[in-house]
Amino acid sequence: MTISLYAASIPVFKQMLNAMSGVLTKAEAHATAKNIDPSVFLQARLAPDMFPLVRQVQIAVDFAKGVSGRLAEIELPKYDDSETTFAELQALIVKVLAFVETIKAEQIDGKEGIEIITRQGTPKEKRFTGQAYLLTYGLPQFFFHVTTTYAILRHNGVEVGKRDYMGAF
């Protein structure tokens, strides 16, 4: 069985971004119902040396945007990562979903062998083929930050479960 780069990326990003949006909606409702300042959740971390929830969401959506755009070899929209509220995070997800939805299968399929160069926060660069970039770097990074977003909220008492994490499929 073969699977196209498009099938392994765009539908996955859409499903999980929508699911993450749903988890954030539940978190905001939980904060309201329990009279908890939303910043308690937005700034929560799993460990002191990890990013807070806001940054986890920003990084997750950045990977969905970046991986999709790099595979399609198109210019990436730039966002300033200044979100501080649930509403602003939801708006960011909506923007990235809109961008991801513009990418068509013919823009990605057949790009398994293109070269993608990353500079992961340092001057060092890493070179990937399109396929390796998606499967060994992009998707694992995306899922790490989506999962960490979920875990932060669940750890802090938000009633979310596996169905919330996975969303509609």
Regions found by a protein language model. Give the residues of each.
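Short, highly charged C-terminal tails/helix-capping segments
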Residues: V160-F169
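Helix-adjacent hinge/juxtasegments
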Residues: K65-E106
